Amino acid sequence: AQTAVRDRVYKSNAWFAKYAAKAFEVEIARYFKIVEEEANQEELQQQMLRVNQLPSLQEILDLEKEKPGSADVILQSRDRFSQNLQQDKLHDYLQERLDRRLARLTTDPGAPKFASLFVLNPHGTITAVAYDDKSITSNSVGKNFCFRTYFHGGPRDLDREIRTPEIAPIQDSHLSAVFQSTTTKIWKVAFSAPIYQPSGDGGKRLVGIMAITVNLGDFASYRNQNQKNTFAVLIDGRPGIEQGTILNHPAFSSGLSQTMGGHEKHFRIEPEQLKNLQLETYQLYQDPIAQAPHGEDYRGDWIAAIEPVRLPGSPIDPETATNPLSELMIVVQENDRVTTEPLLQLGKELLKEGILAICVLSLITGGLWFFVARTMGKTPSGGDRPLEITATPGNSRPQSHDLTTMAATPDQQPDDRS
């Protein structure tokens, strides 16, 4: 019975995982559409052209190519660049675009939510950043981030010392690997797209990279997950050391740190457990969040089902994919104890009632046998029944006698004389 219940719960979770994956695919597509729309804004293209030509920005690029020891000079160049009027105009433009997007949340709680919007030049240097929280002061402007996946489009971040042209920028829209913001220290992902400006010969040239970031937990599909016993989790399915990383979990929204202690950077499903989750049968799954100091709500066994999320441009037919794991995966998990405890409790109650019924039946049966046996024991047998003498007319009442036939003695012989 317990296996049947778990199998039923698994099938329910598998259906929910498919539904959640489809909903998330739609949301991901919205983010891609937004970043492409922003990258295609003509005003942004013109602003990027003017900023790219600033001497202070070129000075930063030249200094970064020199040997170590020019850190103070680079800082001075970055300060000059960030104080430039043209750079301020680019920042104000990005802030206005971000505020306009975020304003939609007041009327539509399910609207896309952004943490920041920023642009990089073709060499990977951030030229302007706008945050949803305007009190945040960026320390990223003027720094090179071409090692990030949102710039080069690879599956993982590269060495921080790498520079163009050793690494080339993306040519199409891209979803980055999870990374930690150098300013806010919050884990997030970025949607990025190249900024092209049409050229006179009918072609186009790259003038920068547009990127929008989303804090893990701010995707509409996973906002306000208040259920502690059944919920969906987003994980990174891309091959490599980050495969299985938990990108979104209800625990993150309740204040749990997104990083683990020790050498681990973030919570991650182990490869063996990730492989088992792909089997089309119920699996007892252990939530990695349970390892956190305050992760007691997620300890124990869970019944989990997994479903891939197909990003725009990914193969529709699973047989055409080179890797069975998608870039993103949805895990729907349900607390095994909460699921099976009612069944176990019912079994205990039925066992108690069964034992009680047997005891009552035994008492009733024993009582009946005792009554019958006692009744049978009081009933006289035919040989012991007293002889009843019916009174003759001369007697005043009948008398009962127990007569015993005995041989008469000589003096008791009848007298013939009488």
Language-model segment annotations:
Residues 1-84, 109-115, 172-174, 187-189, ...:
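Juxtamembrane extracytoplasmic/periplasmic/luminal helical "stalk" adjacent to the first N-terminal
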Residues 1-3, 221-223, 317-319, 336-357:
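Membrane-interface helix-start motif
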Residues 30-47, 104-132, 160-164, 168-173, ...:
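Short N-terminal helix-loop-first-beta-strand/juxtamembrane motif that initiates sensory/input modules
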Residues 60, 160, 205, 217-325, ...:
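Intrinsic low-complexity, intrinsically disordered coil/linker regions enriched in small/polar
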Residues 80-100, 134-179, 206, 251-299:
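Extracytoplasmic/periplasmic sensor domains and loops in membrane signaling proteins
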Residues 103-118, 129-222:
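Extracytoplasmic/periplasmic ligand-binding sensor regions of membrane-associated signaling proteins
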Residues 353, 357-378:
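Cytosolic-side ends of inner-membrane transmembrane helices, especially those
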Residues 378-418:
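Cytoplasmic C-terminal tails of single-pass
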